[in-house]
Amino acid sequence: MARSRANRAAESACGHWTTVPCFMCTNQCGLNVYVEDGKVTEIKGMKSHPRSKGGTCVKGRHIVDYMYHEKRLKYPMKKANGGWQRITWDEALDTIATKWQRAKEQYGPASCSVFLGEPACLTIETGWFMAWRLCDLFGTPSRFEPLDLCGTAMWMATLGTFGYLTEPDMENSGCIILWATNPHASDPIGGVLAIEAARKKGAKLIVIDPRRTPFARKADVHIKPNLGTDGYLALAMINVIISEQLYDKEFISKHTVGFDQLAQHARNFTLEEAERICGVPVADIRQAARLYATSHSGCIRHYFRPGFMPDGVHNYRSFAILAALTGNIDRPGGELTFGFAQFAPSTPVRLREKLGDAKWVGQDKFPLFSKYLSFFKDGSMTNFSDSILCEPQQVRNMILCGTNPAVSSNNTAKVKEALSKLDFLVSLDVVMTESNKLADIVLPSTVAFERLNFSTYHGEFIGRQLVEPYHEAKSEFTFWSELGRRMGYGEYFPWQTDVEAMDYFFAPHTVENLLKEHPDGYLNWNVLPGARRYEQNGFPTPSGKLELYSETFRQYGYDPLPTYRGPTVSRTKTPQVFEEYPLQLISGFMEVEYWHSMYHQVDVLRKRAPGMFAEIHPATAAQYGIRDGQPMVIETSTGSVETCARVTRDITPGMVAIPAGWEGNNLVTNDATMDPISGVPECTGLLCRVRPAAGHGKQDVVAVTGDQVMEMAGE
């Protein structure tokens, strides 16, 4: 909102500016926030921020609308007489503690579960600390969070290859591959600025995506593979780089293991077969491989979509090996070390010894998951519905904390059935969601500016509390701490404020001193400049080298080299299924206005992106009698959903694409097939069919044409 000159002159008397990180997504851009009369009233970009450089996306610009929206939850409520009844926090906490203790006595501690949500936007790590701690004390390993729909496969692959995580240095790169990602939606400030800066310096751009995204229009090479074939495409590129001897021979010789096995293996993935499987011309594959390998540096930006396949971990292993072959590791313009926390807790947050031999859900099925990710999480989300619906029932009580699985999880019909079967369901959230509607108790949560935050995602930062909580909202820290004390664990939760807890865990650092030393809240940038540290210290892997061939994978019964199996169903593998479902489905691409299922209540954002839709090519639409802006039905073997058709040439013929986060979009995805290494469900490359909807469809179908949507894009 604009401020008059008179108001600005009076700032020192009635308000002040503060520098904090944004919390509307995991990119965590820098913000200058104006606070007046106890409320946040204005948002500006922080020009000194190294990634966002003063920019803000549409979500960040409308934080005020989000914070003070009338649909925010104001006080605790319990379900009663078919509706909601206001209760006190004391009643809510006492009820939860009693229910959990009784379930523990009758069914054991594993019958009680927590499902932690989006770490960037609701349960920032301060809250996670307390949730982990309470679960350890209570003795339950039944805990879930949505990393399985984001980075599990990627993390397992990079940790298994490099020993650490990496981040592409796009701004300094000579060649950037955008693999199944659209930065204009997922990283619209820092990512877009970095790519544009590199392009101005002459960087080449390769986009691998069936959709024609903004950067695909500008790319030197745009590859549009069949869905689910990314792994074969990457292995074919590896074949080109090795067979044409375009790899960094010195790096491979000194710093890797398994090159000979990889070279032999890669010969199996020919360009001719890649053209047949991937639907990509041989010349395009060869051009992309040569361009990437011969540039002075190269990096690959990918997000979660390549993990949504039966070959998810292998796909990311192939991407990592492309970087390794070209020597683009820990050097400017390549894949930089994504360092872990410099300000790590000096006192352990976890109390694992209290768990004993308890196994988390899915531990036997996904043993390598436990090896690489047990520091971060303790359960496979893919199994969470099964842990409720199985006989005998394993999980009976659950606390949702900033998560909406009834919309965001695969096969939501099954998810809703599972949540409804629970003996007792609690949800801590900002607004009423589809998941909250199934709960017995709903609790109002703070948002980031209403509490202290600490995070290590894009750099370590402290986000100071700027204003008091909205109505009766409480922070995750307060909720878990007070619940722990009611359960009899008071000695483990002695802190009355989150600042006291942070001072304890991070001693000798204190929040006060850290903010004095770093007034903008940014303590350390995790992405370390390319310094080739492996030359002195090697790689943090069992061999001490970058592992092209993974002995660890072999010992766990998995292929030690990345391989390709392809989608569970496809035109070539299951022709009978393809005859019934002849189209490929892209499920869950991102929209810049939202973060998963969040912020749909914000009016300005809803005006720009009013509801769920399906992209379909004009040729495909004509084939099935579908018209732009009219209701259509998408069907898979799992279920069906009615939505609005957006006829566009920005998608490959024979494919249909729907965005993430809208109610109903996961009625057509399944949780029955998954990556056997990570447990990530298969939701890329599913087969579907389409038809026009009868009549005008449901009332919540938003009928807008592609041209109308483009007109709405400006504010």
Ranges and model annotations:
Residues 476-520, 601-615, 619-715:
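Long, contiguous, secondary-structure-rich segments that constitute the structural scaffold
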Residues 237, 257-381:
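Active-site phosphate/pyrophosphate-binding segments
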Residues 77-89, 246-282, 364, 467-543, ...:
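N-terminal leader/propeptide and maturation segments of large enzyme subunits in energy/redox metabolism
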Residues 440:
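Catalytic, metal-anchored helix/loop core of enzyme active sites in primary metabolism
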Residues 219-225, 458-471:
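Short beta-alpha connecting loops at secondary-structure transitions
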Residues 107-111, 247-252, 299, 330-337, ...:
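Flexible, glycine/charged-enriched surface loops at secondary-structure junctions
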Residues 1-244, 273, 281, 401, ...:
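N-terminal export/assembly segments and adjacent metallocofactor-ligating motifs
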Residues 126-208, 215, 231-235, 324-437, ...:
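Extended redox/cofactor-interaction regions of prokaryotic respiratory oxidoreductases
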